[in-house]
């Protein structure tokens, strides 16, 4: 029985090999799970672990709530949504991958049908009938533990999308629209779903509106449609100036500020004193205004001319007669003033405008508005939206209402409402999802303010205006689309409910829902085939944010600004990692610490700073919240109490970098690596690399192929362990305990007692993945790194996956590199490698190819998989079993048969002789043709697995049965082990209960009244322990319970075995017309060879030019030959100096390992070794690694693992300094400049200068020459031109183009050229003739007319020109 100990400081794998860190900054917070963005999003979508009453209005729940209840057209019946539950998936992830199925769970929704009594006169009508039922709504794909989906047997990832946030955005055209370069401002209300509403200025400063980017209309039409009259519109947008007629003089109410900047058209005096303030013709300044305010002038007498041309703010009506003298927005004329005087109207309200900050835009717009009433405005909008349809009042009103004011058609969403309110200055963050009149008014007001110079336009590339849409949200949208389709069908059927007594199940057809979901996961632009080359590529793929996809940008339309690095990317999106090429800047990667908030905006963590003192409190800030804060960088100098020491601190504020005093600082970065993404954080000395090369380095690490033996990098960054454990490729312990059993294919753990809960098994069995094919044909294989009896904790790594070494990411190999030219073989980034690398299989990789053979039901009969193939010799069938399927372990080469298959041929007319032969010898096998699966050209390897899938209901062949047996044996083995451990646990408890108890009787020599001893128990069979009778009733009851537990265990195991058996034995659901599928997996070993692409982590890539014998390689004075020679000219111009520093530190790491190996070989004491390790790990007196927590055995294991070199970590932007590298080299007794004398292997002479030699981590990339090169003799031809196809996939030929023809013409090689252009290309007759000639041993050629010339003739004839060749 295992008992847990106190949580140790280091994990099981870490203790075996510590990585020495040079980081100066302590990590305040751990790096969050790297896949959390995917996992959390989908968890929130499904809400499976939440009770129905506690479910939030998101995900599936929100989709159902938004569509239901569905009412019938008559209103007499409705369907209501009660809740949903997800069932259990039929197959687990591994089985789904093998069988080519989707990993999904059935969705059952509880629907309530409410029928109202239509005959009742009451309102609301009384309920006549309620029926509830669980309705099956299709299958919902489930996310695996590592953030992927298995769709049709392949792993896929749904990439998050970065799209424009809903809300309102104000922008201008940058002067591009009008030739004068005038800025035209516009506003756009973007809903989450629904019509877009645009407001824009034209060059004449009128305001227009567009709905869904259609024809523009004056904005006043929209305002009239909302029910505003001209008077209301003017009062909303303008301040008014009131004018009174007193004693024949016009007095205006004076607000002095309004006169600023105007030129006085008359003298302005102080009424009381007559003092002149402004002379006629002078501009009114701030000084004049002060004087007016001082004199407390209330009104100003203005000449009549001053009023002419001003605009009326209100309608002018003669109250006695009701006669309209003038409309609001009319200009004041001489006639109008006379008419007003005649009618006794003594007061006029005018709108106040000026050219500076109170433009007359809305007034000008009203003047060009053709409509005069609300109805006319609605009709005008109807005509614009539905041109050609005759408008009616009802139709126009309904259309306008449906555009922006109905929840079904329009939704701003919570994010949109929050962004909208904040932008237009509404205090609350919440509000309706539809628009209101006030919303539209406030947008137009804000737009006019911006035009008037108050406020700024928005930056659409600011991360406060772009949000992330993750998997859960996208799936919810698709689900809603499906539900809306269902709703239409249900509405029609609901009217039949009363008459036909239907149930909810009969009304709802779930097909549209499952079709929408299937389409999204199967073919959406954002549901992508997972990049599985290595663990890092998988992690990066799941953390990717794309601006492309439905509702996003397109490559062609995206400009430079969208792609560029923005200041708000800091700590949210990586400025380095993005693809090269057309997608640059559109596809980004999340930064290491970034996460999304409830609104979908990317947040980054910051430490709170109070009065210049840094606290350990961490807050997440989005780009919106960050703007007004002063944020310092993480490497600011602090004292022991956390006070900032510098007088001026560099910080970020208002999206700018500036210097400020410590007391102003509000926040501080959490870590130096929070700027970059996962891939970039794995590049050591990133701070010394040019950004363009770092970009290549980040991207190329994702293409590194897993090698046969993974080797950890000597120089890393400390992120390796985190990436490996979060990626899901290694096996991580779910619970702590003791390793009970380990072999190559599984690990059995006996779990600690305190980590098991009632009803759970105390056994964890981890089945390892062995030689499994990844999406990119690389090999996924797991190897245990624990031994029987090891005590492990939860979270410890139990088995390494591909590209992991002792739980650390290991993408390549450490090679001894020399920077020097070597006979021109490293010209232009070529790489020269030693034969030893090939011999030691350092870069040998395993690739697994999947080849499929399908037997179908054809018109002529069924295809058959068999070993009886016509016209094939015995030797070709030697690798096949009696079922016609290749044996596992067979080594096959190109052209070998893997699966024998025959297809029926069409009946042919037989000659009399054939008829006779057939009559004598019976049915001949001539009616079938060989269509076997053969190994494609250029491929050879070993068969490692075969899967046979047989259609349900067909007889399985012997091979399929033997595969099933193996499968069952594996399941049986797991269950037996689990049962053994659980039985031992029960018997352990029984013996604990029985020992030293007084017995009243029992099997064997047990006398009543005697005590039970261990000897007695050892003699009696365990099964009979339950027959022992005991005085103590409580103990007897416990024994009874344990006995029942044992019985239940047996039943449970039987049930589980039978369930598994049923799954394994059942037939497969194959596509229509398919009878049987055989999948053969070939393991191909690829050694490194010239033409393969290699790279370091700093963007230093190259192609291998030659493999040199070890004895010819440059070597050091002690005889050690270098592994690889790189060109020194590749460093200065590329500015990736990080590779040189890595080389130096790598040399030190290896040298220290050599010193430790020497100490171990000399059998030095553990104390001496510990003292040396202290010097290495805690070089600057700071305790980074606590060696005291290791006992002597653990210390010696650690030292032994360091023989190959001491792994180092130099975190990005916080790495080793030049001085630290030198001190490490000195500690290892190596030259401090990292340069070594090298000797030429061929001559034995020393090279003139010392050479930089050290260890660099090199990767082999997934661009292998074997995949790119192929050879063709004959093959397929293009249909029209009859020329060979191109490319390896089509088994094509080499193009001999125009320029190549010129080259042969220049040499005068006429016959060679003729051969190239005729018999080797498209002379159909000539090429068959030469084939026959060669067979007959005659090597002459007889060229004819190339087919392409005939095509040309046909094309000329198509133009109506009669062209014919004259034959001599």
Curated annotation (Swiss-Prot):
Catalytic reaction list: RNA(n) + a ribonucleoside 5'-triphosphate = RNA(n+1) + diphosphate
UniProt key word Transcription: yes
Disulphide bridges: none
GO molecular function: DNA binding; DNA-directed RNA polymerase activity; ribonucleoside binding
Functional description taken from the UniProt entry: DNA-dependent RNA polymerase catalyzes the transcription of DNA into RNA using the four ribonucleoside triphosphates as substrates.
Subunit structure as annotated in this protein's UniProt entry: The RNAP catalytic core consists of 2 alpha, 1 beta, 1 beta' and 1 omega subunit. When a sigma factor is associated with the core the holoenzyme is formed, which can initiate transcription.
Name of the protein in question: DNA-directed RNA polymerase subunit beta
InterPro entries noted in UniProt: DNA-dir_RNA_pol_bsu_ext_1_sf, DNA-dir_RNA_pol_bsu_external_1, DNA-dir_RNA_pol_su2, DNA-dir_RNAP_su2_dom, DNA-dir_RNAP_su2_hyb_sf, RNA_pol_bsu_bac, RNA_pol_bsu_CS, RNA_pol_bsu_protrusion
Organism: Legionella pneumophila (strain Paris)
Entry EC number(s): 2.7.7.6
